[in-house]
């Protein structure tokens, strides 16, 4: 995701500022599936520290703003580590919505 944040790999961006980038997932799991990432590299939720926690807060501010377009609700997921299903070693939040979502996570 660092290459996407740097503009080296294209993405269908839906939001961008100096700290955060949001773009459509290339393999959507819901009618709306957006990934929200800090532009600065943070490997996973396990790596959040006082030095980078403002980036996480900004990600959630963006999630809240994007969520306004989903008035019937949305889900936010972040996988941390291989057993949780994290396949890209860059902190990211899945914003899922646009229709009924399964109640079960697996």
Predicted regions mapped to residue ranges:
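HIT superfamily nucleotide-processing domains
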Residues: 1-106
């Amino acid at each position: 995701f660092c290459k996407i944040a740097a503009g080296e790999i294209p993405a269908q961006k839906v939001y961008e500022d100096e700290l955060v980038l949001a773009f459509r997932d290339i393999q959507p799991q819901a009618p709306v599936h957006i990934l929200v990432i800090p532009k600065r590299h943070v490997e996973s939720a396990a790596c959040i520290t006082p030095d980078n926690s403002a980036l996480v807060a900004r990600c959630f501010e963006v999630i809240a703003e994007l969520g306004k377009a989903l008035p019937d609700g949305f889900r936010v997921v972040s996988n941390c580590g291989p057993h949780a299903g994290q396949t890209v070693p860059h902190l990211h939040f899945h914003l899922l919505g646009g229709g009924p979502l399964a109640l079960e996570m697996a």
